[in-house]
């Protein structure tokens, strides 16, 4: 059975390491803030100028002036700091962010990423995605395995405008977890009840299964 969105976010939260500085992309990745493992102290950063994002607020905690880059209301943890976009992007471009968890519309088995526009459709802009994939030490994609119409999102080549080439290190979907390697995709983990036959049918490229040592 496929993971729910919360289960996907919880799986992605397992990528977090103690003391890391992490950027969560707009959409599904923002749910990761609600699933940070006990004992793991991370600093979540947002391009609009906040370091120290906490979980999403309850009804009595909402502050309309405290938002993330996707304009969602958030909370701030103790010790959080606020700054301008120039400082925020200096953190990103300067290589000071350890991990970015980003959504995607398409990704290839070589780690190419398309996540900012569909030609002919209105978009607000590319946001910080291009800066993130160029400046962050590790990039994890968190997305549904296939599109709403059933078409593949993991492909040999993206046909949407690229955000970055060879930038993705790991792909987490509602069905599985893959590592992007020089030799292609390696299946690390599958959701409970999801078999290889289903995965191969819903993945637009070949992959190998990680060997257990």
Swiss-Prot record:
SUPFAM superfamilies: NagB/RpiA/CoA transferase-like. Keywords: Lipopolysaccharide biosynthesis, Transferase. It catalyses: a 3-oxo acid + succinyl-CoA = a 3-oxoacyl-CoA + succinate. GO terms for molecular function: CoA-transferase activity; succinyl-CoA:3-oxo-acid CoA-transferase activity. It holds the Pfam family CoA_trans. Pathway: Bacterial outer membrane biogenesis; lipopolysaccharide biosynthesis. One of its GO terms (biological process) is lipopolysaccharide biosynthetic process. Its EC number is 2.8.3.5. The active site is at 47. PANTHER family: KETOACID-COENZYME A TRANSFERASE, SUCCINYL-COA:3-KETOACID COENZYME A TRANSFERASE SUBUNIT B-RELATED. Belongs to the 3-oxoacid CoA-transferase subunit B family. Heterodimer of a subunit A and a subunit B. This is Succinyl-CoA:3-ketoacid coenzyme A transferase subunit B. It comes from Xanthomonas campestris pv. campestris (strain ATCC 33913 / DSM 3586 / NCPPB 528 / LMG 568 / P 25).
């Amino acid at each position: 059975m496929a993971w729910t969105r919360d289960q996907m976010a919880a799986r992605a939260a397992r990528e977090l390491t103690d003391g890391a500085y992490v950027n969560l992309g707009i959409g599904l990745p923002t749910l990761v803030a609600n699933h940070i493992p006990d004992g793991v102290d991370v600093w979540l950063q947002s391009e609009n100028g906040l370091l120290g994002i906490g979980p999403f607020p309850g009804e009595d905690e909402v502050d309309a002036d405290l938002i993330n880059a996707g304009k969602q209301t958030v909370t701030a943890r103790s010790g959080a700091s606020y700054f301008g976009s120039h400082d925020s992007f200096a953190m990103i471009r300067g290589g000071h962010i350890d991990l970015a968890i980003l959504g995607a519309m398409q990704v290839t088995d070589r780690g190419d990423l398309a996540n900012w526009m569909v030609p002919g459709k209105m978009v607000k802009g590319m946001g910080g995605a291009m800066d993130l994939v160029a400046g962050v030490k590790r990039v994890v994609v968190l997305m549904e395995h296939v599109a709403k119409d059933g078409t593949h999102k993991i492909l040999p080549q993206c046909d949407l405008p690229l955000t970055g080439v060879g930038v993705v290190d790991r792909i987490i979907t509602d069905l599985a977890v893959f590592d992007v390697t020089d030799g292609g995709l390696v299946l690390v983990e599958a959701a409970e009840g999801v078999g290889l036959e289903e995965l191969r049918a819903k993945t637009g490229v070949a992959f190998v299964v990680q060997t257990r040592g």
